[in-house]
């Protein structure tokens, strides 16, 4: 196991990640790049980002060469934050009467896409569904996953406390679904 010098950076899809930076890994959320390591597999050396997911403390190794394909990306900027809030504020969400297993599959695909906008749509749809009927165990779990992914990334993007961001999200939904 070789550790590469900290000053060595890698360009990925126009984005350079350095040790200490935060990035988003699809389906897992925000993590910190702890190191860039080189490992040898079948005689070929390959560089990896070693990333610790902030919420779960899980460590993920992402091949530097394949990180763009894996969906590794920077935390969103202020314009993208506005777009997330716009998605959450959308009203008149159509309720999909598809069986739960089909909705679950669609929601998981959106969550694993790495797009915070897709995750915001999942959160909005599940909140809307929650107003309409009691969520099943699986739906509640999916709701929590989506909410936590959104809350963590927005709190870092806005440099706000997670509880404050959660309150803002709850306020949006409360206004949208007043009875």
Regions found by a protein language model. Give the residues of each.
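Short, Lys/Arg-enriched N-terminal segments with co-localized hydrophobic residues
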Residues: 1-15
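A positional/architectural concept
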Residues: 13-70
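Charge/polar-rich, low-complexity and marginally structured segments
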Residues: 65-179
């Amino acid at each position: 196991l070789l550790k590469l010098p900290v000053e060595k950076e890698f360009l990925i899809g126009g984005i350079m990640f350095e040790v200490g930076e935060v990035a988003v890994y699809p389906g897992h959320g925000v993590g910190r790049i702890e190191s860039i390591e080189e490992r040898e597999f079948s005689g070929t050396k390959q560089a990896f980002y070693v990333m610790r997911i902030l919420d779960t403390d899980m460590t993920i190794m992402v091949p530097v060469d394949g990180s763009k394909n894996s969906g590794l990306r920077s935390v969103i900027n202020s314009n993208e934050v506005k777009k997330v809030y716009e998605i959450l504020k959308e009203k008149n969400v159509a309720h999909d009467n598809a069986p739960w297993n089909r909705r679950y599959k669609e929601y998981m695909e959106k969550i694993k896409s790495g797009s915070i906008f897709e995750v915001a749509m999942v959160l909005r749809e599940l909140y809307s569904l929650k107003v309409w009927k009691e969520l099943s165990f699986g739906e509640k779990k999916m709701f929590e996953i989506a909410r936590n992914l959104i809350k963590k990334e927005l709190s870092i993007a806005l440099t706000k406390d997670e509880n404050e961001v959660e309150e803002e999200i709850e306020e949006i939904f409360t206004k949208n679904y007043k009875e």
